[in-house]
């Protein structure tokens, strides 16, 4: 078992091995935050064209559309991931910028005050924003790639992960 594991048991399986939603009713209500990021890699010619056009495509503003789609996804994560709790999202922020010549970095930070964390919401927001960038640019090339998508940090639960955002 890895050193950072709390137990070998998966929390979304009950004692009989059946899928279940975690009961968070006994957890303390605390401020929760999480940041996730995803990346979109473009072919060199496509990246150059996007830079020249100010990250606009024939479909419109790429960053603006990705932020809207990512925010919508954050708010609907519980409808996409079966055992996620519906959460009252207090804040959702995106940072989208170039990380090198061909790599667009998408960072999503989510905050709420609740009994459970917002990691899945941040991961979903970053993922859907990246998928939206792909959709907005696919007329230029299908040779783009997405990833890695990862949790960068989380705060407010039993343990904190990563640097504070």
Curated annotation (Swiss-Prot):
Gene3D superfamilies: Molybdopterin cofactor biosynthesis C (MoaC) domain. CDD domains: MoaC_PE (cd01420). Its EC number is 4.6.1.17. The active site is at 135. The keyword Protein transport does not apply. Keywords: Lyase, Molybdenum cofactor biosynthesis. Pfam families: MoaC. Pathway: Cofactor biosynthesis; molybdopterin biosynthesis. One of its GO terms (molecular function) is cyclic pyranopterin monophosphate synthase activity. Substrate binds at residues 83-85, 120-121. It comes from the Bacteria. It catalyses: (8S)-3',8-cyclo-7,8-dihydroguanosine 5'-triphosphate = cyclic pyranopterin phosphate + diphosphate. GO terms for biological process: Mo-molybdopterin cofactor biosynthetic process. Belongs to the MoaC family. Catalyzes the conversion of (8S)-3',8-cyclo-7,8-dihydroguanosine 5'-triphosphate to cyclic pyranopterin monophosphate (cPMP). NCBIfam families: moaC (TIGR00581), PRK09364.1 (NF006870). Homohexamer; trimer of dimers. This is Cyclic pyranopterin monophosphate synthase. The gene is moaC.
């Amino acid at each position: 078992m890895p050193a950072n594991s709390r137990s070998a048991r998966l929390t979304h399986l009950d004692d009989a091995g059946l899928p279940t939603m975690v009961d968070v009713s006994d957890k303390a209500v605390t401020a929760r935050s999480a940041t996730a990021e995803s990346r979109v890699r473009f072919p060199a010619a496509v990246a150059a064209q996007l830079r020249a056009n100010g990250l606009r495509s024939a479909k419109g503003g790429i960053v603006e559309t990705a932020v809207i789609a990512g925010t919508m996804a954050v708010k609907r994560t519980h409808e996409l991931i079966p055992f996620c709790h519906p959460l009252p999202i207090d804040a959702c922020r995106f940072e989208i910028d170039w990380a090198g010549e061909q790599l667009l970095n998408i960072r999503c930070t989510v905050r709420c005050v609740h009994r459970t964390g917002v990691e899945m919401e941040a991961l979903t927001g970053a993922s859907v924003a990246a998928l939206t960038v792909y959709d907005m640019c696919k007329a230029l090339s299908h040779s783009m790639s997405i990833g890695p998508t990862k949790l960068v940090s989380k705060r407010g639960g039993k343990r904190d992960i990563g640097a504070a955002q």
